Regions:
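Conserved acidic donor-binding segment of nucleotide-sugar-dependent glycosyltransferases
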Residues: 344-345, 349-356, 365-371
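Short hydrophobic beta-strand element within catalytic cores of glycosyltransferases
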Residues: 329-332
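A charged, aromatic-enriched C-terminal amphipathic alpha-helix characteristic of glycosyltransferases
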Residues: 70, 358, 371-403
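Nucleotide-activated donor-binding/catalytic signature segment of Leloir-type glycosyltransferases, i.e.
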Residues: 257, 261-291, 295
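Aromatic "clamp/platform" in nucleotide-sugar-dependent glycosyltransferases that forms part
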Residues: 312
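Acceptor-binding helix/loop patch of EC 2.4 sugar-transfer enzymes
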Residues: 51-62, 112-151, 192, 196-201, ...
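Conserved donor-binding/catalytic core segment of Leloir-type glycosyltransferases
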Residues: 205-228, 234-239, 249-252
Length: 411
């Protein structure tokens, strides 16, 4: 069957699914933004979208929808040309709803089945908004702003035939009337690559090598920011380093903002928070390595003695489950997305998000007594194998789901 993937940064969440469906003989095509330079084994067509400046005062709560629907219009116009000029009609469209690209595709191809990747539905209460009072002052206006950001996300599913979310908690953020059409299948992790390796090493900039057995504490995120607990982790470090004089801390992540706002007058949170604790740190043992190639990330998870992962009630990072697959002892925040995967004392450890002293104590314990937590590391690996194995569990389920939406074979 013909399958059209739609994602402004393709392959995105379809990195493994699209090639797998192509390998199974399906005619796969992707529609993506003209600025997207990522490689793809699936043929790609590009639409041109020039974002217009939006008058916030005039649009008020409609600003987000204006921006997203504008992209939806650009995408739909490209889709219409694809239909008119090449007579292209997909059987299934699988698109991410986050940027509005799927909003009008049913107007171009009403006969196609539309599957929407439903990653997260913003809420004024009970999720990320208002969670961290240090950076978010609760107000009714804030609640309405958050609700206003959901307009394109809800509309995307209203016009869709089905939805897909990676976790139960993320699916639960959607209203009940929409939640019923969403199936939960995680993207999965490659457990054959992310596996324990006692021979692994990680090179530091000064030429030193970190090895399995070394006292290595790790923290990984796309960008270093409050949404992922960077401020809490950094505030916990002085006590950890004082208690563990041999510990080395490796921090992976960029100095931009993926979620929320940047500090006033600055591009990111890295130095803003670091400067708060710098005088209390042995900075020679804290290694900011920026964004690293995937092979280096894998090696780092393999040498990690303790891996800290914190998140607001928000989208769960793949990296947490990848760390578990590599056999790391993950110390995670006691927030709903993490609790869906980690049970305290079973396959990892949990700490209240805001309890800096508890983070210091638990991470110090994890560094000091690795043998005590070896059973947790083994069960973390089992969790990845039994629930999140991409090749054996997640990808087959996703393939089956997509294929179930296509034309049924004649009996």
């Amino acid at each position: 069957m013909k399958i059209l993937f739609v994602h402004q940064n393709f392959p995105g969440q379809f990195l493994h699914l699209a090639p797998e469906l192509k390998a199974r003989g399906h005619d796969c095509l992707a529609l993506t933004d003209a600025t997207n330079k990522r490689a793809s084994v699936v043929p790609v067509l590009k639409y041109k979208h020039e974002a217009q400046t939006v008058d916030a005062a005039a649009c008020r709560l409609g600003r987000n929808y204006t921006q997203m629907s504008d992209r939806g219009v650009s995408c739909a116009r490209a889709a219409l040309q694809l239909r008119l000029q090449q007579n292209y009609v997909p059987d299934v469209i699988f698109g991410h709803s986050g940027w509005g690209e799927t909003l009008f595709l049913k107007e171009v191809w009403p006969e196609a089945k539309l599957l929407v990747y439903a990653e997260f539905y913003y809420k004024g209460r009970g999720a990320d908004v208002g969670f961290d009072l240090e950076f978010s002052k609760p107000s009714f206006d804030q609640v309405m702003v958050a609700q206003g950001r959901t307009t394109h996300l809800g509309q995307a599913l209203v016009h869709a035939d089905a939805g897909l979310s990676p976790t139960e908690w993320q699916a639960s953020t959607y209203p009940a009337s929409i939640r019923a059409m969403i199936k939960v299948i995680h993207d999965g992790v490659d457990t054959a690559v992310l596996l324990p390796n006692h021979a692994a090493t990680f090179d530091l900039a000064d030429g030193r090598k970190l090895r399995t057995g070394d006292e290595v504490l790790t923290f990984v995120n796309r960008n270093l920011e409050p949404y992922r607990g960077y401020h809490i982790f950094m505030r916990a470090l002085p006590a950890i380093l004082a208690a563990r004089p041999q510990a080395q801390v490796v921090i992976v992540g960029g100095d931009e903002v993926s979620y929320g706002a940047a500090p006033k007058g600055e591009k990111g949170w890295k130095d803003h928070i670091l400067n708060e604790v710098r005088d209390k740190l042995d900075v020679a043992r804290v290694h900011f390595v920026g964004k690293v190639p995937y092979a280096q990330f894998v090696a780092l998870m393999q040498v990690s003695r303790a891996h800290a992962y914190l998140t607001y009630p928000f989208v769960l990072s793949w990296s947490m489950i990848e760390a578990m697959s590599a056999g790391a002892h993950v110390v995670g925040s006691r927030t709903a997305p993490v609790q869906e995967v980690i049970t305290d004392g079973e396959n990892g450890s949990l700490v209240d998000f805001f309890d800096v002293a508890a983070w210091s104590a638990k991470l110090t314990e994890a560094l000091a007594e690795p043998e005590k937590f070896q059973p947790l590391r083994a069960r973390a690996r089992e969790t990845a194998l039994n629930r999140y194995d991409m090749r054996k569990i997640c990808l087959p389920k996703m393939v089956e789901y997509v294929e179930s939406l296509g034309p049924k074979a004649a009996v």
